[in-house]
Amino acid sequence: MPKLKTKSSVKKRFSVTATGKIKSTQSAKRHGMTKRSKRSIRVQRGTTVMNQSDSRIIKLFMPYSR
């Protein structure tokens, strides 16, 4: 049986934690930041853990992750 390929777009955008959760950067921070408060800009600087239903889909595209 041939090896399964990992989607390159998923490989660049998401990472898997040691417990198996999917971690990604915050979305909606490319442009239009002048309309937002400083607090919302600061909160979006970090990363977030995806919910269970979305992470199940992402794990299908990364067959060799934990």
UniProtKB/Swiss-Prot annotation:
Residues 18-41 are annotated as: Disordered. Residues 28-41 have a biased composition (Basic residues). GO terms for biological process: translation. InterPro entries: Ribosomal_bL35, Ribosomal_bL35-like, Ribosomal_bL35_CS, Ribosomal_bL35_sf. One of its GO terms (molecular function) is structural constituent of ribosome. Gene3D superfamilies: 4.10.410.60. Keywords: Ribonucleoprotein, Ribosomal protein. The keyword Ribonucleoprotein applies. GO terms for cellular component: cytosolic large ribosomal subunit. Residues 18-27 have a biased composition (Polar residues). NCBIfam families: rpmI_bact. Belongs to the bacterial ribosomal protein bL35 family. HAMAP family: Ribosomal_bL35 (MF_00514). This is Large ribosomal subunit protein bL35. It comes from Ehrlichia ruminantium (strain Gardel). The lineage of its organism: Bacteria, Pseudomonadati, Pseudomonadota, Alphaproteobacteria, Rickettsiales.
